[in-house]
Amino acid sequence: MVARRNKPKAPLVKHRFSGGDSHKPKPPPATKQPFSGVESHKPKTSPATKQKFSGVESHKPKTPPGKQRFSGAESRKPKTPPATKQKFSSLERSALYARREAANILRTVLRGDAERRAVASIKSLVLSPSVRNKRGTFALVCETLKYLTVIKDVLDIANVLNSKWKRQEPLVFIVCYDILFGKDTPSIGDAEKFLMRHKEALLSGLATLLVRKKVDSVDQLLGSKLTGHLKPRYVRVNTLKMDVDSAVQELEKHYTVQKDETVPDLLVLPPGSDLHAHRLVANGRIFLQGKASSMVAAALQPQAGWEVLDACSAPGNKTIHLAALMEGQGKIIACELNEERVKRLEHTIKLSGASNIEVCHGDFLGLNPKDPSFAKIRAILLDPSCSGSGTITDRLDHLLPSHSEDNNMNYDSMRLHKLAVFQKKALAHALSFPKVERVVYSTCSIYQIENEDVVSSVLPLASSLGFKLATPFPQWQRRGLPVFAGSEHLLRMDPVEDKEGFFIALFVRANKLDNPKSSELPDRVCRRRPKERTMQLHPYLCPKMFRAWSGTLHRLKTRFLLSRNGC
């Protein structure tokens, strides 16, 4: 056993001691290896040691691989062309950006439509400051939605999408529209190149679809979606920057212009007039705003120097109209909850040049009417979220997948009920501000549940607070549905006759107009105890405690009225 141990130890010890003695001379054999060049193992280690330690000699063999790498990169230029990128024209780049921007908007619209969730209209999304090519983006979104069912059927027949592009369906829909129905053939972009490789399969799928549907053209597949909706182009003059006559003179150089009979600062142009890129629109001298939207602020009739609250203000067209009607004087508090819509609101205010608007990023229902900062509010404009059923064509909602001939304007009853509950709360909250004299409630809906029913449910509370219904625009012929006494004061617009559906109700505090006697007020107000009698019944209450006690009773009474009316 000793012999066995000694035999392997001896060579190991020899190697260890020889290796230990060679700690100092180890570098010389490493340097001698490239010079000797005798043993086959030494030249294998020498290049590695040369590359690591010999700075000058190692760079010489390294440079050829480096050059080969750069030459390899040069050889890839025809495959991923940096040189061809420089040859892209500005039109190609603009089309590429427009397709991406259109895909983002299409994704938002389709997601909201699938979830039956209210989102901004296509026009509002396109007019966002982040969208550069507004005209091209708007056209792509509208045309893709028009042909969307056909595009989906063609993609199902062709079966060319993999998992990667199925996750980017909005962009695929946009590019497929350009390939199948567009004027320009897309040439740059990953999605464009992928679908162009399958162009023949897509065209073959379209031909197969026509045969299956037994039609001769794509127009027969689309049906009613091709029917146009001729509506005049309305333009509101921003009187903070320009007077109406000057705007008429400028626009008459290229268009036929008429002044609207209802709203003084509103102009009427022929249908199809495209003013998105007009100089007056770009510098905020005129705004593309519909007639119904312009009538809302005009119905409120705010006076110069007033403090006005715009409860749901984004995107801001009605807000800046209020500022123009007030001649830039007084103060407007623009309240908006959504952060993205606040940005749009601020951009609109900046473009208009209005300096008397203060943006409040928060929930209107969360505002305290007794807060000293709202003590001087004399007018409130309330245009809350609604179904938008009166502006389906204007919003282009008729292009969405959920819209059909059989289900035209047929909204979910549960969603309508939720909207109506919110609208009642918002209107009751607006009427509770102590110094407010005028309140306008408006919707772009045609449904009674959002219009007359909301007003009638809040009317007892409004009467107890001294409000009555007034008649905005007495010359207007179309009035509210005759479902309660006083509905003739309400204003309606018909989506067929007036090209858009709208509803306006105006509340005016009665004691600010004629100071009625106590016997003329509702019985609920007459039964209120006078303050002197209460102080006699409770002599131990100091005035401060009495005010707190009476305020509590007032809040309880308001809650009782709201609960009784289903708010």
UniProtKB/Swiss-Prot annotation:
InterPro entries found in the cross-reference section: MeTrfase_RsmB-F_NOP2_cat, MeTrfase_RsmB-F_NOP2_dom, NSUN5_7_fdxn-like, NSUN5_RCM1_N, RCMT, SAM-dependent_MTases_sf
Q: Which SUPFAM superfamilies match?
A: S-adenosyl-L-methionine-dependent methyltransferases (SSF53335)
Active site (UniProt): C444 (nucleophile)
- Recorded GO terms, molecular function? mRNA binding; RNA methyltransferase activity
- What GO biological process term is on the record, naming one? rRNA processing
Task: Give start-end positions of Basic residues composition bias.
Answer: 1-17
List keywords of the entry alphabetically: Methyltransferase, RNA-binding, rRNA processing, S-adenosyl-L-methionine, Transferase
Record carries keyword Transmembrane: no
Catalytic reaction equation(s) = a cytidine in 25S rRNA + S-adenosyl-L-methionine = a 5-methylcytidine in 25S rRNA + S-adenosyl-L-homocysteine + H(+)
Look up the domain of life of the source: Eukaryota
Q: Which residues bind S-adenosyl-L-methionine?
A: C312, S313, A314, P315, G316, N317, K318, E336, D363, D383
Recorded phenotype for the gene knockout or disruption: Reduced methylation of the C(5) position of cytosine 2268 (m5C2268) in 25S rRNA.
Please give the residue ranges the record annotates as the region Disordered. Answer: 1-88
What does the protein in this record do? S-adenosyl-L-methionine-dependent methyltransferase that specifically methylates the C(5) position of cytosine 2268 (m5C2268) in 25S rRNA.
User: Can you tell me which family this protein belongs to?
Assistant: Belongs to the class I-like SAM-binding methyltransferase superfamily. RsmB/NOP family.
- Return the protein name: 25S rRNA (cytosine-C(5))-methyltransferase NSUN5
- Source organism of the structure: Arabidopsis thaliana (Mouse-ear cress)
